[in-house]
Amino acid sequence: MTGCLKIGPGDEAPDVVNVVIEIPMNSSVKYEFDKEACIVKVDRFLYTSMVYPFNYGFIPGTLEEDGDPVDVLVISREPVAPGSLIEAVPVAVLDMEDEEGPDSKVVAVPKAKLDPLFASYKDVGDIPDALKSKIKHFFEHYKELEPGKWVRVTGWRPAADAKEIIRRAIERYKGA
């Protein structure tokens, strides 16, 4: 959970959500938010010669079934510093699983007032195939050289499913 944070998922959630960025785009360092120390720490350096294609973080005030907040990949044109908060609009879900089980990611874009470039992305079909391929390729391969780790991407789902995942995770957090 994210008990040290005094912010939640956002007043407009699940349509617009707060995302705490852990990993900036173009980074090969995997950062994670340390809930005890309330700081972003280095988790590991990627073993592959790859970088995160976009900014990556989580929605505070949410709880997935695996005990972690909802993961979010924010499609954007600039890196956002670790620990920063960005308001984002969920547009899709990337379904995947790894060595620990299901590990889907919500895919979002910055709120239009922050960056209008992606305002036309409302649903999974609005994301260009080239971007979806880039995202899928990254998640399929970024753990390849790590012993005992693997990832399999199983598909894409629409914005409505992303919002339902967020809605359930907010309720789960409130009940915890």
Curated annotation (Swiss-Prot):
Keywords carried by this UniProt record: Cytoplasm, Hydrolase, Magnesium, Metal-binding
Subunit and partners: Homohexamer.
Known function: Catalyzes the hydrolysis of inorganic pyrophosphate (PPi) forming two phosphate ions.
GO cellular component: cytoplasm
Pfam families in the cross-refs: Pyrophosphatase
Name listed for the protein in its UniProt record: Inorganic pyrophosphatase
Catalytic activity: diphosphate + H2O = 2 phosphate + H(+)
Record GO terms (molecular function): inorganic diphosphate phosphatase activity; magnesium ion binding
